[in-house]
Swiss-Prot record:
Cytokine that acts as a physiological ligand for receptor tyrosine kinase LTK, leading to its activation. Monomeric ALKAL1 binds to LTK, leading to LTK homodimerization and activation. In contrast to ALKAL2, does not act as a potent physiological ligand for ALK. The gene is Alkal1. Belongs to the ALKAL family. PANTHER family: ALK AND LTK LIGAND 1, ALK AND LTK LIGAND 2-RELATED. Disulfide bonds join C88-C124, C102-C111. This is ALK and LTK ligand 1. It comes from Mus musculus. Keywords: Cell membrane, Cytokine, Disulfide bond, Membrane, Secreted, Signal.
Length: 127
């Protein structure tokens, strides 16, 4: 049997009852989502018994201390014994401490070549 269309007075009464009803009874409650979820499923927030989460530090990647003499070791290996005169020390320090070639491990070989060229340049071999 087909349902008949509700009459106009019945639908008007339903709309009037909906408009006059107090807030919070018309659909969803007036609480925050977190309060509703916590009320419905408190077991979501509790850890499973018998299991223990590892501490945060052990889950992250370990950071090993960097060898500060690594740069010196690499450059001495590539250049051999190189000495700089007192007049050339300013240029050496600028190159050694302030360039990408001498501060990035991937470019240490290039740094060694630059330091070798600086050592034999006319600027540094004036003595």
């Amino acid at each position: 049997m087909w349902l008949t269309k509700p009459s106009t007075p019945v639908s008007a009464l339903l709309l009037l009852a909906l408009a006059l009803s107090p807030p919070g009874t018309q659909g969803r409650p007036q609480r925050s989502l977190a309060a509703r979820v916590a009320e419905l499923r408190p077991e979501l927030f509790l850890p499973v018994t018998g299991t223990r989460l590892p501490p945060r530090a052990s889950r992250s990647t370990e950071i090993f201390p960097r060898d500060l003499t690594l740069k010196d070791k690499f450059i001495k290996h590539f250049t051999g014994p190189v000495t700089f005169s007192a007049e050339c020390s300013k240029h050496f320090h600028r190159l050694y401490h302030n360039t990408r070639d001498c501060s990035t491990p991937a470019y240490y070989k290039r740094c060694a070549r630059l330091l070798t060229r600086l050592a034999v340049s006319p600027l540094c071999s004036q003595t």
